[in-house]
Regions:
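C-terminal motif of bacterial Sec signal peptides marking the signal peptidase cleavage site
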Residues: 5-8
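First exposed extracellular module after export/assembly in secreted or surface-exposed proteins
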Residues: 17-141
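Bacterial signal peptide processing site
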Residues: 10-12
Length: 141
């Protein structure tokens, strides 16, 4: 599930294609059992972002290790669309742990995994944002 915080704004600079940016990352060094949390800011002219936030994890160290990389579709919570919508989506992952409310991610197993995440947002009218990438994140073995 993706928690969402949003509010309407009177600016005319919003576009039909959703705009996203990374507001924050909980940590760049994650120990096993920790939650990695991303806050993604968004704007949308029509406010119809209630479709899908896509996430891709890319390992720089062990790309062929099963489970070290993935692409995941995450449903954005349904709400009443408001023009010129601005807000924050939060998505998190439990690292090698079953944490209620979060998907689980894994790393390289026997060594640290340096990875990064890509995000893109699709709205109800099938408009897709640009793809954004996180900084490197280290999943400690």
């Amino acid at each position: 599930a993706i928690p969402a915080m949003f509010y309407a704004c009177k600016k005319d600079t919003y576009t039909t294609k959703p705009q996203i940016s990374i507001k924050s990352i909980s940590s760049k060094n994650i120990s096993q059992g920790d939650v990695l949390l991303f806050s993604i800011d968004f704007t949308d002219k029509e406010g119809d972002i209630q479709d899908t936030l896509w996430v891709q994890k890319i390992s720089r160290i062990c790309p062929t290790t099963p489970g070290a990389q993935f692409i995941q579709a995450n449903r954005v919570p349904d709400f009443t669309a408001t023009s010129n919508l601005k807000g924050t989506l939060e998505i998190g992952y439990g690292y090698n742990a079953n944490v209620q409310g979060y998907s689980t991610i894994s790393g390289c197993g026997t060594r640290n995994d340096t990875c990064y995440f890509k995000f893109w947002l699709k709205d109800k009218a099938n408009n897709v944002s640009d793809t954004i990438s996180s900084e490197n994140i280290v999943l400690l073995k």
